[in-house]
Amino acid sequence: MIDPSSSFDRIKKEARLLREQLHVHNINYHVKDDPVISDGEYDRMMQRLIAIETQFPELSTPDSPTRRIGAKALTAFETAEHAIPMQSLDNAFSDQDVIDFHNRTAKILNTSDIRYTVEPKLDGVAVELRYEQGSLTLALTRGDGTMGEVITDNARTIPSVPLKLAPAGNGTIPDVLEVRGEVIINSKDFEGLNKKRLATGEPLFANPRNAAAGSLRQLDSRVTAKRPLEIFVYGVGRAQELMANFDIGSHSALLESLKRLGFRINPLIRSGLSLTEVLDRFKAFETMRQDLDYEIDGMVIKVDDIVFQERLGTKARSPRWAIAYKFPAMEETTVINDIIVQVGRTGTLTPVAILEPVNIGGVMVARASLHNQDEIQNKDIRINDTVLVKRAGDVIPKVVKPVTALRTGSERVFVMPTHCPVCHSPVRRLDNEAAVKCINASCKAQLKQRLKHFVSKGGFDMEGLGTKLIDQLVDRTLVGSFADLFTLDRETLAAMDRMGEKSATNIVQAIERSKRIPLKRFLFALGMAHTGESAAQLLSSTFFTLEALLKASAEALGAIEGVGPKTADSVVAFFANPDNQETIARMMENGVVIENHTVVESAALDNATFFSEKRVVLTGTLGTLTRSEAKQRLEEQGARVVSSVSKNTDILVAGEASGSKLVKARSLGVTIMDEQTFLEHLDRG
């Protein structure tokens, strides 16, 4: 509510000041990742400006931050011409293609001393933003490169799109500036968006790129405002004044100037690279790809020197000074030949698509989990369907959607069985869960999966006890519980198919070595529902001994940060089961020794390290350690590694391409540590 005693001039001045402050804070948060005020203070300032502009509409300006909320709906999109065409890029698919590009470039320039700027090729939607006297006046999609759709109202809703440019360098702002960038939705936000659509019965987006494109093409910008869009700027259209004002001689200098004006530039961009360094950087992108917050499908390579760019010129559809080095395709179409059902260690029935084998990203894919009946129904996936299958990094292949246009009428609807396909016991769907479960605890399929988990590296680590051997042992009724593994002898094992005396001896020795096990690995090995490695570590470091854990109530377990009610109930129910109690007792009778947390971590507890008892979050990509290696070393030094940032987090280790966790950590005042500092503390112990 506006104070009626305030003069119009005072209110006008306040509105102007609020707009200026909100623009600065918006750049600090979305571009610099360095907020200086709390979210609550930002919201209060925004609400105050909204109140002023609502009561005095004449005070609202085209570049007001309130425009991010959205404007009234359009009936159709207008189109407009790009002053300078938005060309596409030629593609490279191998190192040799890039070498050929370099050689062609060197021949035209008559020098091989060429430096490049490289950037991740974002899998999003290309747009152009036009600024006049520093204010956003027009936003266009790429369209056909010559004409694009006008999406100005929608672009204004994107938090990382500056509505007003920040003076930089010599303090001047170009009269006209056209910048180009990629609008994306990060992976986590995409999952959240699809969950909301699933809950409201709306069709799901196939991938983040489609979601971004669909969001930008909303006629009602108020819908766009609710979508988690963001932008990275990578270049310019008309920018003669900018280039002259800042005496810009390279692409890297151009990006730095754009950053000073308030645009968000991708932190993974590297400049001044030789050909060899370019090829090395591509390999680095392939490695870090799966850890990024957003999807990339390759790397863009640009000649850095602007004079060289001008000498190289352009072809009809693409510049000669840039090329896109694409990753191997991570999406392909294939046919679902059948859908089978597998039974997991907790009894969950999982439908699995048997695919016509297809090469995706260099890996032959012949099957993919369909998760549950709801997933199949929501996506309308059928046997004999042609489907789009996706594989990103090392992630398990996923059926994205059916290609309904290719249906022939031979497709069949899949129905989840009412009885377990292995033991034929009735199955049951639990309340509020999508999973269907076999309720027979003696089901051989469940037993096999539990045993495979039990002997895995994260559990008892019984080297040599593989899938086929476990199947034989269960099928011949030689093993019916975890405890039976510790009674196996050389003669029994040697009698199995494809098993000689030496192999049998090695397995017996591996079983013997496994008998001494840390509490956290013991808990993980048991395969309790909702209890993975992180939960097992939290339980171990909280209760220290199995005896203390057995006495804990579900309420006490649920109170541990990182242990939810499902895990708490599962652990209590597991240890209350008489059969499980008997199995654990038999294991101990056969020589299993559970090392208490205090014994396992004695070095960390008796000789406190920098990380002792600290809650640590890892984000981004580390250059020298994998995520699991870093986690292991932290835990060895007494740290508690958690997955999300909260007010209780002590340290955030920020690797390359750190995202939203870094922003949140800064806003909460969490200590942020780069990789070099992190390694130094680890090495000091």
From Swiss-Prot:
Residues 606-685 form the BRCT domain. The keyword Transferase does not apply. The active site is at K121. It catalyses: NAD(+) + (deoxyribonucleotide)n-3'-hydroxyl + 5'-phospho-(deoxyribonucleotide)m = (deoxyribonucleotide)n+m + AMP + beta-nicotinamide D-nucleotide. Keywords: DNA damage, DNA repair, DNA replication, Ligase, Magnesium, Manganese, Metal-binding, NAD, Zinc. Its EC number is 6.5.1.2. CDD domains: BRCT_DNA_ligase_like, LIGANc. It is an enzyme of class 6 (ligase). GO terms for molecular function: DNA binding; DNA ligase (NAD+) activity; metal ion binding. GO terms for biological process: DNA repair; DNA replication. Transmembrane segments: none annotated. PROSITE patterns: BRCT (PS50172), DNA_LIGASE_N2 (PS01056). Its cofactor is Mg(2+); Mn(2+). NAD(+) binds at D39, G40, E41, Y42, D43, S88, L89, E119, R142, E182, K302, K326. Gene3D superfamilies: 5' to 3' exonuclease, C-terminal subdomain, 6.20.10.30, BRCT domain, DNA ligase/mRNA capping enzyme, Helix hairpin bin, Nucleic acid-binding proteins. Belongs to the NAD-dependent DNA ligase family. LigA subfamily. NCBIfam families: dnlj, PRK07956.1. DNA ligase that catalyzes the formation of phosphodiester linkages between 5'-phosphoryl and 3'-hydroxyl groups in double-stranded DNA using NAD as a coenzyme and as the energy source for the reaction. It is essential for DNA replication and repair of damaged DNA. This is DNA ligase. The gene is ligA.
